[in-house]
Amino acid sequence: MITGKDMYDVLAAMVPLYVAMILAYGSVRWWGIFTPDQCSGINRFVAVFAVPLLSFHFISSNDPYAMNYHFLAADSLQKVVILAALFLWQAFSRRGSLEWMITLFSLSTLPNTLVMGIPLLRAMYGDFSGNLMVQIVVLQSIIWYTLMLFLFEFRGAKLLISEQFPETAGSITSFRVDSDVISLNGREPLQTDAEIGDDGKLHVVVRRSSAASSMISSFNKSHGGGLNSSMITPRASNLTGVEIYSVQSSREPTPRASSFNQTDFYAMFNASKAPSPRHGYTNSYGGAGAGPGGDVYSLQSSKGVTPRTSNFDEEVMKTAKKAGRGGRSMSGELYNNNSVPSYPPPNPMFTGSTSGASGVKKKESGGGGSGGGVGVGGQNKEMNMFVWSSSASPVSEANAKNAMTRGSSTDVSTDPKVSIPPHDNLATKAMQNLIENMSPGRKGHVEMDQDGNNGGKSPYMGKKGSDVEDGGPGPRKQQMPPASVMTRLILIMVWRKLIRNPNTYSSLFGLAWSLVSFKWNIKMPTIMSGSISILSDAGLGMAMFSLGLFMALQPKIIACGKSVAGFAMAVRFLTGPAVIAATSIAIGIRGDLLHIAIVQAALPQGIVPFVFAKEYNVHPDILSTAVIFGMLVALPVTVLYYVLLGL
């Protein structure tokens, strides 16, 4: 039976943690003591020093030879059961997705055991329960957080491959990742080089691209006063995990306002009307002053020909034609000898290029159905810029249908002066649709195929791996490299993440020291233990203080909507405890050990899963709400479980 003293002990353990959190919240929101930059510094200190040393302190002081394997088996079985159920749901349900699988696994199985669990369970059930929580922390740090990283990197690799190698992924036999590439989370610009071997297989090299960011910087400086800055600002999209640089405009009027400056656009593309004799659809960027290497291929038909020749590489267009199949397209950016790139601005997220092997060269064009771009010209002609467009959004999908409908009924120019060689059709169609989509109300110029028929497809609007015509075949299943190749790539990226994470070292060193010290009864030198304890003692309070700063910096406590927040709280405080109760009973756990397992599963959401979700952009709003709102309701919920289980 729970007495008043028991309740007081629980509150005495938990209230100080909430005091630290409230003080941090007030320091930002009410009193303005800390700026966001200062908060970032505090959070960095907590992540690099306070929490790792706190983890080391708890793990190194726990006896690994007295671990309760039944309790650990029940906890591990809970996670395996939930993960298996989510995997089956993701594999066989139409509504299943890898992103939701990861998020639901985090919500249901990964509580804040280190910061909240140890003091709370010790106050409720005694010191032995605190030792059980330390054992859970060891498994979380070494196994379950590593599994989370594996899932996130698998998602990042899948996105990268599907966008840059949508039809040839099955031919990839190896990946080599440069040492300065830390993650495939999509936050840093990456460049892929694909070498074609004698066996016809692809050998891909992934490296960080400095050219993409430098070109974006050059474009910003050159057009800072002319083009609206929002045109190159990332905006939200339903392509989860991708920051999308695109123009906020569409062909049809939409509820959102357009930030596109049409005057600047036409001024840029109408600077010259004289085409190349070979290609009839060209413009010089910036007019006569653009100098050599300034050809931009657009849909502005010429009024006559000029004696000058184009510096355009026909091999690029031949490659573009091949790469355009299956609904992919090129948006036609050309890079001119380190000068300003043509409009629209390239996306620095991913770039791709290929280098030859055994005298064989082939370019892999990415930007799978959402839209992409090929950049060539001068010394940069080996680089392909992959633009991750938001054409998968509902507005853009509607525009794709409208564009196709109009394409079949639009008057077609048949002037022989502006006819296009067959190998140029895909590129010019792509540029046409780009211009039409960015210029509401403008009547487009629709190209004809060799038979004089409109193809009925918009390469720019094409969906990945499918024909976008009404009545066309459904999407084909995305090819992926062999499992061994994917596994090796993901293990490389996970390893690079782990060796840069201080918590990895603190957990492994703490476990190693505990194995040695409890085996041979060796005590840590006083100087070393004192150096660790002076920071680890502050770790618990600083972790809660950092959480309060995080809460204060968020615009809303409930960032994902009330219905989604309610669903997340149900998964966190009901599903997790229910499943671990079932797995514990199945293993044969009863009494206080069963109660500890259930209360531990009802702790608030862990912070580390939120950090991963934020970094990889997989439902960070849901995890943010689970952390913040979960901390507010965790005390009454866990006390309620404690009281009900003690009846």
Curated annotation (Swiss-Prot):
Q: Null mutant: what phenotype?
A: Loss-of-function mutations impair the root gravitropic response, lead to an increased sensitivity to ethylene and auxin transport inhibitors, and give rise to an auxin accumulation in root tips. Exclusive NPY5/MEL1 cytosolic subcellular localization and in apolar aggregates close to the plasma membrane in root epidermis and lateral root cap cells.
Domain of life where this protein originates: Eukaryota
Q: Which residues carry this modification: Phosphothreonine?
A: 354
Q: Topology versus the membrane, per the UniProt entry?
A: Multi-pass membrane protein
Mutating residue 258 to A: what's the consequence? Reduced phosphorylation and lost ability to recruit NPY1/MAB4 and NPY5/MEL1 to the plasma membrane
Q: In which tissues is it expressed?
A: Root-specific. Localized to the cortex, epidermis and lateral root cap, predominantly at the upper side of cells.
Q: Which GO terms describe its biological process?
A: auxin polar transport; auxin-activated signaling pathway; positive gravitropism; response to auxin; response to ethylene; response to glucose; response to hypoxia
Segments on the Cytoplasmic face? 29-38, 90-100, 153-507, 553-568, 614-626
- List keywords of the entry alphabetically: Auxin signaling pathway, Cell membrane, Membrane, Phosphoprotein, Transmembrane, Transmembrane helix, Transport
Q: Which residues lie on this side of the membrane: Extracellular?
A: 1-7, 60-68, 122-131, 529-531, 590-592
Q: Where in the cell is it found?
A: Cell membrane
Tell whether Aminoacyl-tRNA synthetase is among the UniProt keywords.
Answer: no
One GO cellular component this record assigns the protein to is:
basal part of cell
The biased composition feature labelled Gly residues covers 366-378
Q: Which residues carry the post-translational modification Phosphoserine, per the record?
A: 237, 258, 310, 393
Q: Name one Pfam family in it.
A: Mem_trans
Q: Where are the transmembrane segments?
A: 8-28, 39-59, 69-89, 101-121, 132-152, 508-528, 532-552, 569-589, 593-613, 627-647
Family classification: Belongs to the auxin efflux carrier (TC 2.A.69.1) family.
Q: Any idea what this protein is called?
A: Auxin efflux carrier component 2
Look up and give the organism this protein is from. Arabidopsis thaliana
